[in-house]
Amino acid sequence: MSSNQQPVVLGKLGSCHGIKGWLKITAYTDSVEGIFDYSPWLIKENGEWREVKVIQWRYQGKAVVAELEGVTTRERAQMLTNCEIGILPEQMNDLPEDEFYWRDLIGCEVINTNGYNMGVVDQIVETGSNDVLLVKANAKDSFGKVERMLPFVPGQFILKVDVQGKQILVDWDPDF
């Protein structure tokens, strides 16, 4: 992995399962199985990313557990508990033109149709009905806002997303 590539975090390793080094998996993917579509994984252990392969995985009750290459004892698995699971950015699936990964939206400037800079996307929240952009307002916001919440509804409030230019054009009143 080159030093300028930041892995995309897809989950984390949980507690041990059994005595043969299996670990519970917490996945941040849409479905828990989705994390197993990617191989190899990168594991962040002691601040360093290293490559690891999943040998096999299965459901264990309501949890998902996995056997990782080179992890054959409970003691070794315990050393990996709470380590992040990542992949290289180029391992991500290509998306249709009007879909975006959250990581690509974070850091984008949000500009309304009147040209007002509303701030920068700080994080995104999944609400069930639609995602919501949490926009950190500029230090000298004319409306005294610190943060804004904008529904990510393309065509209604989100007019254009320029991932390369790191800008999102919105139809939204900055005072709301």
UniProtKB/Swiss-Prot annotation:
* Molecular functions per Gene Ontology: ribosome binding
> Disulphide bridges in this chain?
none
User: What's one Pfam family the UniProt record gives for this protein?
Assistant: RimM
An example GO biological process term is: rRNA processing
Q: Which InterPro entries match?
A: PRC-brl_dom, PRC_barrel-like_sf, RimM, RimM_N, RimM_N_sf, Transl_B-barrel_sf
The UniProt keyword set, sorted, is:
Chaperone, Cytoplasm, Ribosome biogenesis, rRNA processing
Q: Which Gene3D superfamilies match?
A: PRC-barrel domain, RimM
- Asked whether the keyword Chaperone is assigned, the reply is yes
Q: Give the protein's recorded name.
A: Ribosome maturation factor RimM
User: Which species expresses this protein natively?
Assistant: Shewanella sp. (strain ANA-3)
